[in-house]
């Protein structure tokens, strides 16, 4: 996915510059870079991923003139467990929640929500599909996301944007608050 596609999916969620956000399951940073650009130089993005190689790649692609924006701090860690992060003005989990088993998803979403300030958004980017494969072992349709966020004690998500997925189907972004 290109940075501009990631920006198109999440831009409606970033309503003001600055703030402290986390990109959970950041990988090599496509959505981290998009978020950093949207937040601008007064923002901070904590990019959390369990793969040190992906985070090294992310470090190489941020903080340069070619990718201006928020300060990006990489953290090697598993977003499904406890995280040592400050209170967040927003959290993004893009193309990562579908790796968490259905039985663990509510607890993970509750844990992430506990890091958010009162009105802060949780932004989710996922594939709108039901077909399971090795890349999307636990698909989360918009309807499934609604059930998940309600189970986790959050509100009803609103779809922000959709676009064709690279290989098949659709990718969507959604925002949810308490």
Question: Residues of each region from the PLM?
Answer:
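Class I SAM-dependent methyltransferase SAM/SAH-binding core
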Residues: 22, 28, 33-81
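A short acidic, Gly/Pro-enriched loop at the edge of an enzyme's catalytic core
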Residues: 80-91
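A short SAM/SAH-binding and catalytic strip from SAM-dependent methyltransferases
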Residues: 89-103
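A short glycine-rich, Lys/Arg-flanked "PGG" loop and its adjoining helix->strand segment in the class I
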Residues: 106-118
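Acceptor-substrate binding/catalytic loop of class I
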Residues: 130-144
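Core SAM-dependent methyltransferase catalytic element
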Residues: 161-178
């Amino acid at each position: 996915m290109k940075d501009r596609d990631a920006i198109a999916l999440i831009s409606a969620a970033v309503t003001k510059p600055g703030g402290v956000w986390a990109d959970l399951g950041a990988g090599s940073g496509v959505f981290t870079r998009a978020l950093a650009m949207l937040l601008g130089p007064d923002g901070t993005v904590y990019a959390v991923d369990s793969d040190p190689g992906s985070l090294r790649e992310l470090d190489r692609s941020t903080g340069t003139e070619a990718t201006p924006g928020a300060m990006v701090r990489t953290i090697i860690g598993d977003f499904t467990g406890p995280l040592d992060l400050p209170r967040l003005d927003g959290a993004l989990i893009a193309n990562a929640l579908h790796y968490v088993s259905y039985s663990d998803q509510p607890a993970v979403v509750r844990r992430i929500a506990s890091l958010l300030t009162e009105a802060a958004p949780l932004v989710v980017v996922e594939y709108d599909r039901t077909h399971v494969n090795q890349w999307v072992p636990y698909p989360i349709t918009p309807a499934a996301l609604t059930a998940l966020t309600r189970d986790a004690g959050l509100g009803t998500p609103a779809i922000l944007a959709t676009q064709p997925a690279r290989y098949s189907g659709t990718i969507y972004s959604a925002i949810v608050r308490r």
